Design a protein with these regions (language model features):
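C-terminal helical subdomain
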Residues: 180, 186, 202-246, 250-251
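Substrate-binding pocket helix/loop in short-chain dehydrogenase/reductase
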Residues: 100-101, 108-113
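The beta1-alpha1 cofactor-binding region of Rossmann-like NAD(H)/NADP(H)-dependent oxidoreductases
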Residues: 42, 63-74, 106
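Residue(s) in the substrate-gating loop at a strand-loop-helix junction
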Residues: 144
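Conserved glycine-rich Rossmann-like NAD(P)H-binding loop of the short-chain dehydrogenase/reductase
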Residues: 30-46
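Conserved glycine-rich cofactor-binding loop
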Residues: 16-17
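Active-site helix of classical SDR
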Residues: 124, 160-162
Length: 258
């Protein structure tokens, strides 16, 4: 537990399972109270109860669809009502979609954009003015290791392009906020063993090509515990065997009819 972080408050989105749950636990292990958000209320409340029991911190479970501005506003308001202020934001909610571009449903574009980009930007906008006033705060954005590839991975170009936009935004925000006491860090993880990647065909054929969430937990722990005058701009955590090192990912199993 970090004495400097004990009693602070973090919002973690997409936190009922997978990477988000792991990151909420990481924050709690540092003595940070956590407001966790996800769409499904049942698993969210279960996760909150687990965290309180294991880490002896305060939690708040807020059902939230990050594509809806009113849900984001409710998340921020309820967190401030319970904890007083928001010290840390871990933007993690995300969706993926694997299609060759010419076969990708057009309705996917808006869902991906609102979840993986606008949801992040809007939530940051809702919390950042209080951070600016206090001259203190930390924002961690879940980007993607796919943004390190050139060209972007085949069948993920819309997803990866939006993550590229998020990476650029996050980097620009770092420079805009660095003299105001606010840290902004981007995480660029490789393909991680979660239920989200379980839907991807070739990637999950060999478990050695997947990372565990522990590597990302360690990256977040590092970002939160470096000295006050230091901020990691980007942290790339890539499995040595990750498929993102190859520009082409075969597309075959899940949509053979397309």
């Amino acid at each position: 537990m970090s004495a400097e972080l004990k009693g602070k408050t973090a919002i973690v989105t997409g936190a009922s399972r997978g990477i988000g749950k792991a990151l909420a636990c990481t924050a709690a292990s540092l003595g940070i109270n956590v407001a966790i958000a996800a769409r499904q209320e049942g698993p969210l409340k279960e996760t909150a109860a687990e965290i309180e029991k294991q880490y002896k911190v305060k939690t708040l479970a807020v059902p939230c669809d990050v594509t809806k501005l009113e849900d984001l506003e409710n998340l921020v308001n309820k967190t401030k009502e319970k904890f007083g202020q928001i010290d840390i934001l871990i933007n993690n909610a995300g969706v993926s979609s694997q299609y060759p571009f010419e076969k990708q449903p057009i309705e996917d574009f808006e869902k991906l954009a609102h979840t993986n980009y606008l949801g992040y930007v809007r939530l940051i906008r809702l919390v950042i003015n209080d951070m600016i006033e206090r001259k203190s705060g930390a924002i961690i954005n879940m980007v993607s290791g796919s943004t390190l590839c050139d060209p972007l991975p085949r069948s993920f170009i819309v997803y990866s392009s939006l993550k590229m936009g998020l990476r650029a935004f996050s980097k620009a925000l770092f420079w805009e906020m660095r003299d105001r006491g606010i840290k902004v860090t981007s995480l660029l993880p490789g393909v991680t063993d979660t239920d989200l990647t379980g839907k991807l065909d070739e990637i999950t054929a060999d478990a050695s090509r997947l990372m565990s969430t522990k590597a990302i937990e360690d990256a977040v722990r590092f970002a939160l515990t470096v000295p006050a005058n230091v901020c990691p701009l980007e942290i790339a955590v890539i499995n040595q065997q990750t498929p993102w090192t190859k520009p082409v990912i075969p597309y075959k199993q899940e949509h053979p009819e397309k």
